[in-house]
UniProtKB/Swiss-Prot annotation:
NCBIfam families: tRNA (guanosine(46)-N7)-methyltransferase TrmB (TIGR00091)
Name recorded for this polypeptide: tRNA (guanine-N(7)-)-methyltransferase
Protein's job: Catalyzes the formation of N(7)-methylguanine at position 46 (m7G46) in tRNA.
Residues bound to substrate: K117, D149
Associated pathway: tRNA modification; N(7)-methylguanine-tRNA biosynthesis
Family: Belongs to the class I-like SAM-binding methyltransferase superfamily. TrmB family.
One GO cellular component, as annotated: tRNA methyltransferase complex
Enzyme Commission number(s) from the entry: 2.1.1.33
InterPro entries (UniProt xref): SAM-dependent_MTases_sf, tRNA_(Gua-N-7)_MeTrfase_Trmb, tRNA_methyltr_TrmB_bact
Any one GO molecular-function label of the UniProt entry: tRNA (guanine(46)-N7)-methyltransferase activity
Active site positions: D113
Keywords recorded for this protein, A-Z: Methyltransferase, S-adenosyl-L-methionine, Transferase, tRNA processing
Pfam families, A to Z: Methyltransf_4
Gene name of the record: trmB
Amino acid sequence: MTQHMIEIKSPYFLREESLASPADFAAVFGNRNPLVLEIGCGIGDFVTQLASSAPERNYLAIDIYNKGCNKTCNRLEQARLTNVRVMRIEARYLLEQFLATESLAAVYINCPDPWPKKRHLKRRLVNERFLQTLLHYLQPGGELFFSSDVADYAHAVTAHLNQIKGYENRLPVPVALDMAGYPLSKYMRRFLAQGQSIHFIHHRRNPQHTCETAAPQPVHRGFRTAWSANNG
């Protein structure tokens, strides 16, 4: 089914054609505050809470769904925040095309599609290849936050992180069932109200780590990039 396209006219919305490669986000925000990325912003509940609590940081919220981007922009306008921008773009394409290496202070990925069927596991966004790529774009000491309502996905991500030199766990356990002070999206709150669990991961790029692997392979534009068994 083709999603009805909403023309987004909000000043919070960034269009690809308005950006250089890599983009100058200091110019976009009008300052050089640390840049934080949220992958999969949904309707914008999480990033609105996060940006409100840390106005000294800039936030780029992305999603592949036009409707979600529009709702996020509307929510930001209501909150009158100035430190958030929204893009409709696929995460891997954003990293390769518009972000400079070591440009991100933090990345948040909350409850991405778990693709629970065994034959679809290779479609998960957060796999070993993606985490290796992400390491290039995190600043030394840059943080990675991941959450999932599917325990198997969270533990798979932990296993991938343990295989990659350069990440270090910031929690006393590999996967936590609670994280003090962590904003909860509407989806998370609804899930918890049903008596289910959210599984949290918090790693960072080791400040002493130098990325010695080859630069990430180019990613072609699109909201459904090619999947392969080699993606992890």
